[in-house]
């Protein structure tokens, strides 16, 4: 096998591994986001900010 062919095989293999790793990381991120939905810092700050700016109307 020539140098060019071996280089192409290595690039293809790296591309395959990169694609698989991208899918794994995105699935893990999605699962983490779904599991930790209420404890996300941005979600909490937006919730608190809304409560401070617009207090609930009582009676």
Curated annotation (Swiss-Prot):
Spans through the membrane: 7-27
Q: What are the entry keywords?
A: Cell membrane, Membrane, Toxin-antitoxin system, Transmembrane, Transmembrane helix
Topology in the membrane? Single-pass membrane protein
* Localization per record: Cell membrane
Induction per the UniProt record: The antisense RNA ratA acts as an antitoxin by annealing to the mRNA of txpA and causing its degradation, protecting the cell from TxpA by blocking the production of the toxin. A type I toxin-antitoxin (TA) system, where expression of the proteinaceous toxin is controlled by an antisense sRNA.
Q: What is its main location?
A: membrane
- Name the coiled-coil region(s): none
A GO cellular component term found in this entry reads:
plasma membrane
- What is this protein for, i.e. what is its function? Toxic component of a type I toxin-antitoxin (TA) system. Overexpression of txpA causes cell lysis; the TxpA protein has been suggested to act on the cell membrane or might possibly block cell wall synthesis. Overexpression in E.coli is not toxic.
Q: State any further remark.
A: Encoded in a 48-kb, phage-like element known as skin.
Output this protein's name. Answer: Toxin TxpA
Native source organism of the sequence: Bacillus subtilis (strain 168)
Top-level taxonomy: Bacteria, Bacillati, Bacillota, Bacilli, Bacillales
């Amino acid at each position: 096998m020539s140098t060019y062919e071996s280089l192409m095989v290595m690039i293809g293999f790296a591309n395959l591994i990169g694609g698989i790793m991208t899918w794994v990381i995105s699935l893990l991120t999605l699962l983490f986001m779904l599991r930790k939905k209420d404890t996300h810092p941005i979600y909490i700050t937006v919730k608190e900010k809304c409560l401070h700016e617009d207090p609930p109307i009582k009676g």
